[in-house]
């Protein structure tokens, strides 16, 4: 298992990953640096990304990264050159596009044909990539990788992806009289954001995928390869919440004579872009006190100069909410802090970890001095 660092990574989280003993997948030189700073064994690191720079590739090879997942013909050449220059044989996987329409938002669906990631099985570019890798003595092809998207519920798309990848493993065996030993089926397991949502448990997904892999390998007469998955959201998403302070409460009259209450908080799209980017939905609760007031239909909005800076479009909140109240938005651990920005020059909030009733800061709050630090 590899933890998908893009969901959320900092040095302390990297230390936890090291202590747990699982691997980690990173997709930039920056994420690689954090993983290494946290003491993760480079052999347990996978490097992803559709546009790795030469510098990132050379850093990965020099650091001893266990596997580089190749995403283009250019990249095959670049990794081969970097490995040869370092007098190493670099283990690689090929990222494949199995041509699957995962049922999720179009911005996080990654395995259909019209997408920037991977080599298409259907078009034949995957076979071209196989030939390219095999032409380099500095590369060792270990197997195939596919990631069909994010926030996916159910196993059908994952099982179909496994079926198509194993079909290509069989074709490889028939052509080259040898079997590739690894199959990485990515992540993307959905979590609960609202009451009533049913999350996908990675351990259960792994069992279902293992059964599908075994069945398809038996059909093709293949040995069962080592299977990997890459959960990120499913691990970190439910473990974190964002705590906002209410700044203003405003009632507005709409054109049809109805009213809408706007509750503005001290964050928004700079700490959680997902509602604006994907239309992601969340819930929230009053966190600093209890209230017996009647609920009022409200819109929770951020402090940024954007009409679209909406945290929750429609939510029932107590009628007596006032400035200074605290609102907790759960399930913000994935793609919140990791996609955060300094839009409007708003400093990013801290990250606080809680264990056994004790809290400690693991990423400090940014200051205005931090925002000015790189200016010349």
Residue ranges and their predicted role:
Residues 2-182, 191, 212, 217, ...:
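Active-site-proximal beta-alpha core segment in soluble small-molecule metabolic enzymes
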Residues 2-3, 8, 117, 158, ...:
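Aromatic side chains
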Residues 113, 196-199:
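Gly/Pro-rich active-site loop or hairpin
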Residues 152-167, 198-207, 240-247:
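Short, electropositive alpha-helical surface patch
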